[in-house]
């Protein structure tokens, strides 16, 4: 169970160093292949809430990439209605076994803070983001206030 050993080590590192933008990490010690936590973005329009994500690691980790799902709804061109995310670092063709979970999380936070309309999962939102940023930000902020999780205060 090489995956479990590596994940235990990575989890300890993340908890020891702390990540400002990834909080409330929950992992069942009996099953290290599923992590949950809160993404806490810095940039508007997403800084009005937090977003629960789930990271599912395959048994073949680190030789196969983890899968990330947003459990909190988000108005974002790179994240679809089912919570699936288009994140190049964890795509099968780009994945490298040396990539660590904290790097994946940092990439995810960067994507949430700075949408990439050229790689959309939701073409309508990418178009709105590109053509009418003000309208997009207003809609995304309202959506975040309505569906987002409460941000940790500490």
Swiss-Prot record:
Start and end residues of each UBC core domain: 2-149
Active-site residues per Swiss-Prot or TrEMBL entry: 86 (glycyl thioester intermediate)
One Pfam family from the record: UQ_con
UniProt pathway annotation: Protein modification; protein ubiquitination
Entry's Gene Ontology cellular component terms: nucleus
Protein's UniProt keywords contain Signal: no
Catalysed reactions listed for this entry: S-ubiquitinyl-[E1 ubiquitin-activating enzyme]-L-cysteine + [E2 ubiquitin-conjugating enzyme]-L-cysteine = [E1 ubiquitin-activating enzyme]-L-cysteine + S-ubiquitinyl-[E2 ubiquitin-conjugating enzyme]-L-cysteine
Keywords: ATP-binding, Ligase, Nucleotide-binding, Transferase, Ubl conjugation pathway
The protein's Enzyme Commission number: 2.3.2.23
GO molecular function: ATP binding; ligase activity; ubiquitin conjugating enzyme activity
GO biological process: protein K11-linked ubiquitination; ubiquitin-dependent protein catabolic process
Highest taxon listed in the record's lineage: Eukaryota
Protein purpose: Catalyzes the covalent attachment of ubiquitin to other proteins.
Entry similarity comment: Belongs to the ubiquitin-conjugating enzyme family.
PANTHER family per the UniProt record, alphabetical: UBIQUITIN-CONJUGATING ENZYME E2 (PTHR24067)
Protein name in the entry: Ubiquitin-conjugating enzyme E2 L5
Organism, as annotated: Homo sapiens (Human)
């Amino acid at each position: 169970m090489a995956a479990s050993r590596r994940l235990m080590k990575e989890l300890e590192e993340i908890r020891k160093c702390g990540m400002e933008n990834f909080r409330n990490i929950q992992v069942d010690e009996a099953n290290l292949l599923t992590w949950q936590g809160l993404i806490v973005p810095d940039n508007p329009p997403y800084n009005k809430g937090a977003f629960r994500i789930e990271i599912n690691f395959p048994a073949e980790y680190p030789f196969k990439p983890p899968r990330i799902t947003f459990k909190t709804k988000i108005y974002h061109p790179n994240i679809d209605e089912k919570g699936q995310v288009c994140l190049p670092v964890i795509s099968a063709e780009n994945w490298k076994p040396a990539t660590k979970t904290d790097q994946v999380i940092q990439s995810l936070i960067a994507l949430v803070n700075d949408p990439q309309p050229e790689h959309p999962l939701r073409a309508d939102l990418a178009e709105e983001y590109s053509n009418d940023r003000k309208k997009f930000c207003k809609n995304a902020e309202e959506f975040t206030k309505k569906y987002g999780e409460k941000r940790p205060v500490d």
